[in-house]
């Protein structure tokens, strides 16, 4: 009886929440129905429901070729590397920035490292080309003026893991740094004052105060990136290597593979299958990662 | 009192929630006010309301200021003739690939659409986007299109109608006439063998001019020498991954082009030229098209696969050079070429019959075609003095300032009777028959379309392999002796043999019914 009344008490609150709930339902849950397309031979005039069901046939092209292993390895490998570097370099830069005392220079540095993040990947790809071009590239100009043979970057795959990592860090590091910096700024000054009174060095302060207090932010950002481990930055892997076939074994990721394979036919069922596969893997990864976090540091787990 | 307050709050919440929900769905009713206006004005004698035909006009990106005036002028022809009004819907080319599917999925009103510009009619049919128009095709239309009609026929039903009745495509070389005279370079009348190419390129190199002989492009799409080899790609002229028919006017055996000696020869030649410095060295990555390279003076010649509109005059204007054409391969008609631009009726059209009637009228009434292509004479175009059928922008207007038609990509009507824009000249109409059924060579497979649905996985995989290996090979950047065997093996692993086998069996079945 009591329980019942409590339920009734919350009705106005639920109604207040209704628009939001409806929004979530319409925007985030109803489209889930579209997942069906991945298992159908989609036909616009028949619609989603009536199109013939084909089971897992749409997924075959993702696994059937020798590329399956390469694209999986590249996607996950690059992502793990990027997550690691983004975190380490981001935290380091944030700490450095925090130590800059002059307001003007701090703002200048902050803007400078964030600026590349605002650039389109197409622009970035041309910037890279200015450095790496065969005939017109700056690096090759330098090499030839030193009497060294020029390097055909766009045909030599050994350089590309390094180039892609560099470009990715150069472009994205500013964004992570800003988030870390925001949490560092939030750390109370009194910890540092107390530490200074006790005679702690700068390094000790960083190691024993800043980093431990940054841990929740780091864990959250890493968990979120884990949720994207099977997706890749299409611009980075397609535009920056200029779609060069010779480089595919180190630049081909699941997104670029799907794009190239379906460019001609534009088949909506096959592309949905790829997206479904990516989402499924990401979902599993994020659940596993979250459980690991739960085990070691329960209060920092996302859910 | 307190209770009332609660009830009141609940009611308020409900109202708020409701308005939010209904706010999303009140879009449809006020969509086309134009419809009502035109309907009032044009009710005709037989009492039947004229049907409003929505026609997709693909352009680059402009929105035409005078589109309604043009619509009215068109209606003056169409209402008495076939009792319909038109509504022109401009669609920028970058949206065209997705617009039709969005409109059909959302059941928005659309009738006549461009097919083939970005997506082939067969793909659109497979996705259920086109209506079956077999029964509406008039005898005149049948006669005009002749064998070309087969290209838009799938499983015995007509789904698309060729927009250009002279769709033959030639392979040719354009070279800079001024440079050739200045440096005394002799270019033969026609090119057929690899020695001919070598001969020209060597002369260019030895002449000491600052330009390279030619640019091999970025390897996307088929290279010119492949067109020169007289191939029918059976619906995939880009990656040639369905297998090809060589000399299709007398042969119907599908082979793997990448295994052929001709392909190896081509790659060897290109590699050789690259080594000798005949070609732009970084064409693979520099982001310029071959036409760009020609325009900026980087090369002496440019290869091109030309349809009827892409004349010498047109390309000269585009590159700003005085170009001369050399034939590499005479015009060929294949399903793929016919389907590069055609008309279809959207599967959700309420009146496909009317849409086809309009097409029928369009191909017979040059006045209507000119209206659709160029707008109203005087305000949107002007006849060029001393020509029969050539038009230009009116005085003081150009492509970006004219009120209609500045950047239209769609083509309306019969190419032979409608006007052409400058820089084409009246000569255009003399050569036109070379590109049509009368003058062009006809592939035996004209009308056949490969249904890839049974081997969709293999096709996707093969296309991905072609994308990986082909560009560097055909642009002469890698040694073919090392890479071709690897390429062939990757193709076989991807299942090209299954694709070709399926394609051949479909082709044989199709040939029997012919």
Where are these predicted regions, by residue range?
Chain B
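Conserved N-terminal structural module of periplasmic/extracytoplasmic solute-binding proteins
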Residues: 6-9, 24-189, 193, 252-256, ...
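N-terminal secretory signal peptides that target proteins for export/translocation
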Residues: 1-3
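C-terminal motif of bacterial Sec signal peptides marking the signal peptidase cleavage site
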Residues: 19-23
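Conserved small-residue motifs centered on glycine
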Residues: 357-471, 475-477
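Extracytoplasmic/periplasmic substrate-binding proteins
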Residues: 122-123, 221-247, 268-399
């Amino acid at each position: 009886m009591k329980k019942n009344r409590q339920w009734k008490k919350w009705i106005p609150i639920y109604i207040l929440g209704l628009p939001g709930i409806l929004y979530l339902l319409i925007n985030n849950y109803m489209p889930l129905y579209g997942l069906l397309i991945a298992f159908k031979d989609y036909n616009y005039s028949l619609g989603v429901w009536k199109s013939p069901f084909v089971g897992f046939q749409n997924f075959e092209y993702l696994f059937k070729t020798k590329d399956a292993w390469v694209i999986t390895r590249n996607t996950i490998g690059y992502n793990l590397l990027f997550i690691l570097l983004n975190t380490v370099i981001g935290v380091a830069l944030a700490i450095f920035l925090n130590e800059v005392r002059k307001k003007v220079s701090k703002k200048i540095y902050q803007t400078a490292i964030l600026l590349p993040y605002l650039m389109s990947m197409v622009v970035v790809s041309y910037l890279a080309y200015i450095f790496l071009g065969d005939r017109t590239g700056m690096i090759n100009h330098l090499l030839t003026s030193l009497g060294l043979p020029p390097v055909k970057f766009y045909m030599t795959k050994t350089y590309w893991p390094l180039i892609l990592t560099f470009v990715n860090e150069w472009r994205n590091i500013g964004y992570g740094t800003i988030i870390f910096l925001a949490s560092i700024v939030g750390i109370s000054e009194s910890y540092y004052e107390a530490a200074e009174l006790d005679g702690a060095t700068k390094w000790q302060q960083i190691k024993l105060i800043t980093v431990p207090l940054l841990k929740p932010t780091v864990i959250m950002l890493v968990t979120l990136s884990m949720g994207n481990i099977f997706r890749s930055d299409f611009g980075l892997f397609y535009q920056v290597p200029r779609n060069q076939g010779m480089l595919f074994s180190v630049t081909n990721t699941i997104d670029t593979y799907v794009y190239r394979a379906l460019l001609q036919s534009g088949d909506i069922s096959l592309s949905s299958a790829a997206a479904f596969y990516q989402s499924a893997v990401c979902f599993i990864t994020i659940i596993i990662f979250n459980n690991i976090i739960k085990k070691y540091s329960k209060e920092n787990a996302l859910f | 009192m307190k209770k009332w307050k609660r009830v009141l709050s609940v009611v308020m919440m409900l109202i708020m929630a409701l308005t939010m929900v209904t706010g999303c769905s009140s879009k449809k009713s006020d969509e086309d006010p134009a419809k009502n206006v035109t309907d009032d004005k044009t009710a005709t004698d037989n009492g039947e309301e004229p049907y409003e035909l929505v026609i997709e006009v693909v352009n680059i990106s402009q929105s035409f200021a005078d589109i309604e005036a043009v619509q009215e002028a068109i209606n003056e022809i169409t209402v008495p003739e076939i009792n319909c009004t038109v509504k022109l819907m401009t669609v920028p080319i970058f949206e065209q690939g997705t617009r039709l599917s969005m409109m059909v999925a959302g059941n928005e009103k659309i009738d006549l659409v461009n097919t083939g510009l970005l997506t082939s009619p067969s793909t659109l049919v497979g996705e259920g986007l086109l209506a079956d128009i077999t029964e509406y095709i008039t005898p005149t239309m049948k006669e005009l299109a002749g064998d070309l009609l087969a290209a838009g026929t799938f499983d015995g039903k007509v789904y698309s109608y060729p927009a250009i009745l002279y769709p033959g495509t030639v392979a040719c070389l354009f070279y800079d006439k001024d440079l050739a005279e200045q440096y005394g370079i002799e270019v033969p009348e026609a090119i057929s063998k690899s020695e001919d190419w070598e001969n020209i390129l060597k002369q260019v190199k030895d002449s000491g001019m600052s330009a390279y002989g030619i640019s091999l492009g970025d390897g996307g799409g088929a290279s010119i020498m492949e067109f020169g080899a007289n191939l029918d790609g059976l619906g995939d002229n880009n990656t040639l991954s369905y297998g090809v028919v060589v000399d299709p006017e007398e042969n119907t055996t599908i082979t793997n082009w990448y295994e052929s000696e001709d392909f190896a020869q081509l790659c060897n030649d290109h590699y050789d030229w690259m080594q000798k410095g005949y070609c732009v060295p970084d064409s693979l990555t520099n982001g310029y098209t071959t036409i760009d390279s020609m325009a900026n003076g980087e090369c002496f010649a440019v290869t091109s696969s030309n349809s009827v509109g892409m004349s010498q005059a047109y390309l000269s204007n585009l590159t700003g050079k005085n170009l001369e054409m050399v034939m590499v391969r005479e015009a060929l008609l294949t399903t793929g070429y016919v389907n590069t631009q055609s008309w279809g009726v959207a599967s959700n059209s309420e009146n496909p019959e009317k849409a086809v009637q309009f097409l029928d009228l369009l191909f017979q009434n040059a006045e209507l075609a000119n209206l659709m292509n160029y707008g109203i004479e005087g305000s949107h175009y002007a006849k060029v003095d001393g020509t029969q059928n050539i038009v230009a922008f009116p005085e003081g207007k150009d492509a970006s300032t004219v009120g209609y038609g500045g950047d239209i990509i769609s083509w309306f009507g019969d190419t032979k009777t409608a006007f052409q824009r400058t820089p084409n000249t009246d000569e255009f109409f003399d050569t036109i028959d070379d590109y049509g059924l009368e003058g062009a060579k006809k592939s035996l497979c004209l009308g056949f379309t490969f249904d890839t649905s049974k081997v969709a996985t293999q096709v996707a995989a093969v296309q991905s392999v072609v994308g990986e290996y082909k560009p560097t090979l055909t642009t002469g950047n890698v040694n073919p002796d090392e890479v071709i065997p690897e390429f062939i093996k990757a193709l076989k692993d991807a299942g090209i043999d299954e694709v070709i086998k399926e394609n051949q069996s479909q082709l044989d079945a199709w040939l029997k019914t012919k």
